[in-house]
Amino acid sequence: MRKQKMNRDWIATARTLSEALPYMQRYSGAVVVVKFGGNAMGDDEAMAEFARDIVLMKQVGIHPVVCHGGGPMINDLLGKLGIESRFVRGKRVTTRETVEVVEMVLSGLVNKRIVQAINDAGGRAVGISGKDDDLMVCEPDDPELGFVGRPVEMNVQIIRDLYNAGLIPVIAPVATGMEDNETFNVNGDTAAGAIAGALRADRLLLLTDVAGVKDASGEVLTAMHPDQVRAMIADGTIAGGMIPKTETALKALDEGVRAVVILDGRVPNACLLELFTEHGAGSLIRSTEPRVKPRGLRQGDSGL
């Protein structure tokens, strides 16, 4: 009985791999930017599973670029230091006092934890921040937010150099200001969107702690046109923390990203489900093509 069950499991695994092959072929050579949010990081096992997904993507010819957040970790350290976390319209208020803590957590703690997890999974990851090689240069986003930056200049050649050398870039969202070399905290989604736009990425995956964008009845929408997203923001269907994520998606599409997906990073193998299965995972936003595609690929159809 045990042998029969093992055989069935092996057959199912082999079938899954076989069905994934056309999607792996489609994405070979593609640039996929993955925003790994603090809320999606979970425990060490969740981190290890995410790292294995990223290494597999690299192994099959994708160029994954990881941009991460770290809000819960920042809140935790600020709390230990007796500093209150404040937010305006869902964005962190970053004072001169807290920006050093933010940089320490993002660049020194979270970034290196992700790099180590990817390396432990057999990949070759390199951790950098938006400051390195002037990758991201910012202006103040909003006077109410303090040292929170909005990227205005991007130099992504360092990212291309890394992934073309077989490395996996892992980017902490802190950046240099246009004036006086001030340090700015950049919202993780904003940073990922700006990086994806500058790279003209094939996919931007925004991993979060919800299943995707929901309609008025609470159902997750698996595919959306940008005009539909704008209408849902205007009528209040998209609200709260989903507004900045969908606005990031729209801006990234305007800047040349082929498609954006908002998906639940807590789901095991979420990135692989999105890229290598017929129905994907989460909410896909793009201007053309439906979510559900036939298994048989048309000659010359990139499918991205």
UniProtKB/Swiss-Prot annotation:
HAMAP family: ArgB. Catalyzes the ATP-dependent phosphorylation of N-acetyl-L-glutamate. It catalyses: N-acetyl-L-glutamate + ATP = N-acetyl-L-glutamyl 5-phosphate + ADP. The keyword Amino-acid biosynthesis applies. It is an enzyme of class 2 (transferase). It comes from the Bacteria. CDD domains: AAK_NAGK-C. It comes from Paracoccus denitrificans (strain Pd 1222). The gene is argB. Pathway: Amino-acid biosynthesis; L-arginine biosynthesis; N(2)-acetyl-L-ornithine from L-glutamate: step 2/4. The keyword Amino-acid biosynthesis applies. The lineage of its organism: Bacteria, Pseudomonadati, Pseudomonadota, Alphaproteobacteria, Rhodobacterales. GO terms for biological process: arginine biosynthetic process via ornithine; L-arginine biosynthetic process. It is found in: Cytoplasm. Substrate binds at G70, G71, R92, N185. InterPro entries: AceGlu_kinase-like_sf (IPR036393), AcgluKinase_fam (IPR004662), ArgB (IPR037528), Asp/Glu/Uridylate_kinase (IPR001048), NAGK-C (IPR041727). Its EC number is 2.7.2.8. One of its GO terms (molecular function) is acetylglutamate kinase activity. One of its GO terms (cellular component) is cytoplasm. Keywords: Amino-acid biosynthesis, Arginine biosynthesis, ATP-binding, Cytoplasm, Kinase, Nucleotide-binding, Transferase. The record marks K35, K245 as: Transition state stabilizer. This is Acetylglutamate kinase. Belongs to the acetylglutamate kinase family. ArgB subfamily.
